[in-house]
């Protein structure tokens, strides 16, 4: 299933690439970093980090953005320590709306990501010792969201965005802020 999902993502990207290249401005236009408040399903909120790149436009007003994001949450209740970690690698498409003020660029987007999940639980039972269980899983996720991007100066942009990630058993809502740095092209 994991290989099939990865194959479908790559195939769709390659099939659409030839048409898109004719009208696109693809290349590394900017790189950036973000910080987030992430609220995973059935867990308290936590802090997340991410990096991203602006690959330009594949069509008028449609930008392409690869992302790598990370968050981790640990809890200790009644002698049971548990933690869940998510590292996601994904690709998002963003539609930039035409507005009267070109300094503020609102967008809505969607994307796919592969989530590498790791869970661990440790319980200490008096007289019996410590028991630990771990589990790893890889899942495909769908991201839906939007936000704004605005120039700080000629080389740097600020962005604020909200994304909802639909990932089996680990849906998550994230509010992110980030800075991107434009590369010389």
Task: Identify the role of each PLM range.
Residues 43-49, 75-83, 118-129, 170-176:
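Outer-membrane beta-barrel translocator domains and adjoining extracellular loop/strand segments
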Residues 93, 171-185:
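Outer-membrane beta-barrel "beta-signal"
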Residues 34-38, 67-71, 111-115, 163-165, ...:
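Outer-membrane beta-barrel pore domains and translocons
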Residues 127-167, 178:
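A charged, solvent-exposed segment within the mature domains of Sec-exported extracytoplasmic proteins
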Residues 1-27, 184-185:
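Cleavable N-terminal export/targeting peptides
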Residues 65-67, 90-92, 105-111, 159-163, ...:
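Outer-envelope exported proteins of Gram-negative bacteria
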Residues 24-98, 149, 153-157:
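Glycine- and aromatic-enriched membrane insertion/assembly motifs of diderm outer-membrane
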Residues 22-44, 100-102, 114-139, 184:
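Outer-membrane pore/translocation modules
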